[in-house]
A protein has these predicted regions:
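Periplasmic-binding protein-like
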Residues: 132, 202-212, 255-276
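Short beta-strand->loop
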Residues: 96-107, 126, 256-266, 276-278
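Extracytoplasmic ligand-binding site segments that recognize negatively charged/polar headgroups
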Residues: 31-38, 82-228
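Mature extracytoplasmic/periplasmic domains
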Residues: 275-346
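A ligand-binding cleft/hinge motif common to bilobed small-molecule-binding domains
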Residues: 86-88, 242-257
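Conserved C-terminal helix/tail region of periplasmic/extracytoplasmic solute-binding proteins
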Residues: 339-373
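Early extracytoplasmic/lumenal segment of secretory-pathway proteins
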Residues: 24-89
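A bilobed periplasmic-binding-protein/Venus flytrap-type ligand-binding module shared by bacterial periplasmic
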Residues: 135-142, 178-179, 269-282, 301-304
């Protein structure tokens, strides 16, 4: 009997170690955003399914997961990615293709997932996570009596002298520049991308940043992590900063007197993709975790911690019924969503196909432009 008890004890120990060893690794952008994911649906999913969920930070792109696959040592399971990366990753066989309504849960009322998400996915390897904004902000305590209200003010160094914080990559910057230079987005932002694709369009947009960065009254500080723009504004290193609306919102909630300017915002989408051949792909744990995290309740949960809009219509309904939704129990979150009517009077809808088709050529030009500053 004692031998049997010892054997059972040893077996339970082995099983517990085995279970904990096969944690699902989710890769995201770090800072307040990853914290909102972890608290909003990562931890609840782990508790419900009994599958540990680990979070790893990265700075975007597919180079790291490609290196893992080439080395035959894949450690990532689920990656938070841009639309263009789901297209490229799907085409190159990096990500798993989904059977959408089978793999993802319906809304509480029974509506199929494909109908509950706001719009279709850019590839068969993508499931929507959040909708967010590339906009800009300023520090109300340091800006002076004149306040920026339009996107063109970001480039006006006569009216608003001082350095600007600018995203390190070309994506979003070209759309911002061409719009600030007088191009209205048009229906579905078609005009924005037609102007960029026209002869001289890319050079026209990049020229706006060349002028801004070389201006003695201006100057550029390039950022690569979402936490940087609010920090640069708070410490006075820049007078304005492009960034992600959720990061600016969190800084506001922490007491930094930032003001967001929504004119000309770029409404963008973020997606989850599952790595083909990852540790959690083999045993099915990654799909279980992904299904739970992207449920109605899961996506609504992240909006308790950051001002990014969940992809599901049913998630917004839960938020509206549960206001004040923010973690402080006092702040209504729906008005802070980038999709709120007051914030979408003039906006650009990110076109992932444009970037998937042109990013290599554009990025080469962009990096050459930065090197010449």
């Amino acid at each position: 009997m004692k031998k049997l008890s010892k054997l059972l004890l040893a077996l339970s120990f082995v099983l517990s170690v085995t279970t904990s060893a096969f944690a699902v690794t989710v890769v995201s952008w770090g800072g307040a955003y990853t914290e909102s994911q972890k608290l909003g649906y990562g931890d609840p999913t782990a508790a419900k399914l009994g599958i540990p969920v680990n979070w790893v930070d990265y700075t975007g792109g597919l180079s790291e997961i490609k290196a893992q696959k080439e080395a035959g040592k894949i450690t990532w399971d689920i990656i938070d990615v841009y639309a263009k990366d789901t297209i490229i990753g799907c085409d190159e066989g990096i990500f798993v293709e989904f059977d959408f309504d089978k793999d993802f849960s319906p809304a509480p009322g029974g509506t199929a997932a494909s109908e509950d998400f706001f719009t279709g996915m850019p590839s068969k390897c993508a499931v929507g996570n959040i909708l967010y904004s590339w906009n800009f902000a300023y520090n109300d305590a340091t800006i002076g009596s004149k306040k920026p209200t339009k996107l063109k003010d970001f480039f006006d160094t006569k009216k608003f002298p001082g350095k600007r914080a600018v995203y390190k990559g070309a994506m979003s910057n070209l759309e911002i520049a061409i719009t600030a230079d007088g191009v209205n987005p048009g229906k579905g932002s078609d005009l924005t991308y037609r102007k960029l694709e026209a002869d001289g369009g890319i050079d026209r947009a990049m020229g706006m940043f060349t002028k801004l960065c070389n201006d003695p009254n201006g100057g550029c500080v390039f950022w690569n992590a979402g936490a940087q723009p609010p920090e640069l504004l708070a410490n006075g290193e820049v007078v304005m900063a492009t960034g992600w609306n959720g990061r600016f919102f969190n800084a506001q909630m922490e007491g930094t007197p930032l003001v967001q300017v929504w004119d000309g915002q770029i409404l963008d989408y973020e997606y989850f993709a599952m790595v083909k051949g990852g540790p959690g792909d083999a045993d099915g744990s990654a799909m279980k975790v992904l299904r739970e995290m992207t449920s109605t309740e899961g996506l609504a949960g992240s909006a308790k911690y950051i001002a990014y809009a969940p992809w599901r219509k049913s998630s917004i309904a839960i938020m509206e019924a549960g206001e004040p939704w923010f973690k402080d129990g006092k702040t209504n979150m729906v008005p802070h969503m980038p999709t709120a009517p007051a914030n979408t009077k003039r906006y650009i809808l990110m076109n992932p196909d444009f970037w998937a088709d042109n990013q290599d050529e554009i990025n080469e030009k962009w990096e050459a432009m930065k090197a010449g500053l």
